[in-house]
Amino acid sequence: MKNTPEVKASPQTGYRIPGYLLVVYALLLFTLGWFGHQRWADISPIPLSTSAAAIAAPPTKVGMVPASTAVTADENHPGSLHAAAENSATQTAASGSQTSASSQEATPDTKPAKLVTGWQTAKPGELPYIAFSAHVYTSAPDKRSVTLNGERYREGDSPYQGLVIEQIEQDMVIFSFNGEPFILDSLQDWPGGKPGDDAAQGNEQEPTSKPEQTVRTTKK
């Protein structure tokens, strides 16, 4: 053992990386990692926003097919699909016609009832009820007018069969009914009946103040 020669290790002759290169490599790795993180951050929000929009969107209503109109097919009978489709179309058309008919029947009920206005029909030789609501008298005959049963008339007009407005005076209106003169005081309603009949004249009411009546008298 004492005679064994000592083996001397030779010094290492390998390449050693300088310190500044290590710093450069570290900076490159950090830069690549930072760019990769930014790239991933730009791409990843797209599916997240899409999923969030899908979650926030209201669910779409899907029309439910009634069991009575469902179309079924039998594997052993290929023609059953066509027959079932025809039955479904027939039932759908029948239900649509019933719905439209029911809506048409319900429509007249929703309309308000119209008030009966204008001239009523009287017996032959008699006049119906006349509501005298307005009387306009001026010195110009073409500007004189009266409102009977909600309609405006002038001298010479015939508001009812056989009745003619002959002249509009300041406090009365002169009519002719079937050729007979007939006088009605201003704003005096006619209760109906035959002109000149004492019963009809006795049923006349006293003039009452009406908010809608307008009486205008002008003189030059």
Swiss-Prot record:
UniProt keyword Transport present: yes
Protein name (Swiss-Prot/TrEMBL): General secretion pathway protein B
Nucleotide-binding recorded as keyword: no
Keywords: Cell inner membrane, Cell membrane, Membrane, Transmembrane, Transmembrane helix, Transport
One protein family per Pfam: T2SSB
Record-annotated membrane-spanning stretches: 17-37
Membrane topology listed for this record: Single-pass membrane protein
Record lineage: Bacteria, Pseudomonadati, Pseudomonadota, Gammaproteobacteria, Enterobacterales
Compositionally biased tracts (Low complexity): 85-107
Entry superkingdom: Bacteria
Function: Out proteins are required for the translocation of pectate lyases and cellulases across the outer membrane.
InterPro entries: GspB_C
Biased segments, Polar residues type: 202-220
Subcellular location: Cell inner membrane
Annotated organism of origin: Dickeya dadantii (strain 3937) (Erwinia chrysanthemi (strain 3937))
Assigned protein family: Belongs to the ExeB/OutB/PulB family.
Principal place of residence: membrane
Example GO BP: protein processing
Segments for region (Disordered): 85-114, 188-220
Gene Ontology cellular-component annotations: plasma membrane; type II protein secretion system complex
